[in-house]
Amino acid sequence: MNIQTENTKTVGADFDAVVIGAGFGGLYAVHKLRNEQGLNVRGYDSASDVGGTWWWNRYPGALSDTESYVYRYSFDKELLRKGRWKTRYLTQPEILEYMNEVADHLDLRRSYKFDTKVDGAHYNEKTGLWNVITDSGETVTAKYLVTGLGLLSATNVPKFKGIDDFKGRILHTGAWPEGVDLSNKRVGIIGTGSTGVQVITATAPIAKHLTVFQRSAQYVVPIGNTPQDDATIAEQKANYDNIWNQVKNSVVAFGFEESAEPAETASPEERERVFEAAWQRGGGFYFMFGTFCDIATSQVANDAAADFIKGKIKQIVKDPKVAEKLTPKDLYAKRPLCGNNYYEVYNRDNVTLADVKADPIAEFTPNGIRLESGEEHELDIVIFATGFDAVDGNYVKMDLRGRGGVTMRDTWKEGPLGYLGMMEVDFPNFFMILGPNGPFTNLPPSIETQVEWIADTICAMEEEGVQSVEPTVEARDAWVGTCREIADMTLFPKAESWIFGANIPGKKNAVMFYMAGIGNYRNAISAVKEEGYTSLIRDRTAEKV
């Protein structure tokens, strides 16, 4: 029995649109297409309820590192009036609660089938429809396919010799089960990225012993997750329109005024003063983009910021040998990290740091992990905080086939492409939320921006009577080239990072983001619309059978 009551406008289709995902992107897409445009929409998600990445990532310490008042949708003024955030950043349970409120308020669940994974989607050129295949055996047809698969959702689980012999429990932060108790356990954590920092600082105080297996030392500033009183929240709500106007015209969309002052021309004393103030305030993105404007582009400025953090590591960590292991040797040019007393963790008697770049993991044993030196760490639980096959991971894992049976896997075999971070050549009526070469920002504002453009494009195509729409090769390649040129203007490509796919063995290094900021991105995609979608191929002649 259909879960829909609306009439499908597309002749011969089960639905006008299928939306994959029930995170920030999927929920907003269902709202825009169903509630505002009146299309018949079916949503799918492999989780049991709404939440997307925040449904799966329930590990200890999980939270956003974005100001609470902008880690949400900007359109939900009614929910905003009711909203109450306790601290500067939202925890995972708070974010999930908010997303449930959104789903209830907009009546979104009735369009979804949960606990249902989409295995593949094939475009039928004769009908002009997508055939969407699920793991339940159901196949449905739709004119439009909108994917909110998640920027960071395809979990990366490294392969180690002997892993099946380990008698303890193995967990991944990206698929955290309920009821896990780490207290009084010997815990090993592999990975020290954003998630690793959070789970390390949350686990250290409760574990019997914590061993951190570090491949790359990280630059980590304090998180500064301060309580928010009623007066502060009232001021944020009163200033909401101005805040969001700034966010939508900013670079990283994190809710703070980005600096316009270069560190390169500042005096050493001024740099020290600004960096110290940012350290006390907390926030990874604020430290990189709110202090000076050239930390991500100038070697001189980057060195100054890196040296400041290195000095803090030396000051905080009591054991000089441990401090040396924790001190990064590369540029300060990865995703900016922040944590709750991260470096202080390594002063605890129950915490051991294993430098697995110098002494790699050789194998898992029944009782723990053995390094190549022969040193063995006995463990009850091993946690993989090893991140994700970011951006394109879920797309190449899914059986996506476009015009002529071309697969997304083959299209992106030399690296992910994508037009505006939302479309791809030979994949008609196919729209990605947070696809390759989209903006490198706080995600909810970028998601909103993309979903609104997708909805506007679909609306325009429906009004014009267009059967299918896709980008030209020239437009796609020009956009990819623009993203590469912009990335090369920064220092980010010089650091080994998941931003370019470096965390996945065998994955080719590729530019996967538009790094000129959300303001410039919004202008770029608005221009496509204002110019009459001349960069898109619009076909009115699909054969009906």
Swiss-Prot record:
Its cofactor is FAD. Its EC number is 1.14.13.-. InterPro entries: FAD-binding_Monooxygenases, FAD/NAD-bd_sf, Flavin_mOase-like. FAD binds at F24, D45, W54, D65, Y71, V118. Displays a different regioselectivity from P.lavamentivorans BVMO. The record marks R335 as: Transition state stabilizer. Coiled coil: none annotated. Belongs to the FAD-binding monooxygenase family. Catalyzes a Baeyer-Villiger oxidation reaction, i.e. the insertion of an oxygen atom into a carbon-carbon bond adjacent to a carbonyl, which converts ketones to esters or lactones using NADPH as an electron donor. Besides cycloalkanones, can use cyclic alpha,beta-unsaturated ketones as substrates, leading to conjugated ene-lactones. Can also act on methylated cycloalkanones and methylated cycloalkenones with high enantioselectivity in some cases. Pfam families: FMO-like (PF00743). This enzyme offers a promising route for the synthesis of chiral ene-lactones, when expressed in an engineered strain deprived of enone reductase activity. Keywords: FAD, Flavoprotein, Monooxygenase, NADP, Oxidoreductase. GO terms for molecular function: flavin adenine dinucleotide binding; N,N-dimethylaniline monooxygenase activity; NADP binding. This is Baeyer-Villiger monooxygenase. The keyword Flavoprotein applies. It comes from the Bacteria. It is an enzyme of class 1 (oxidoreductase).
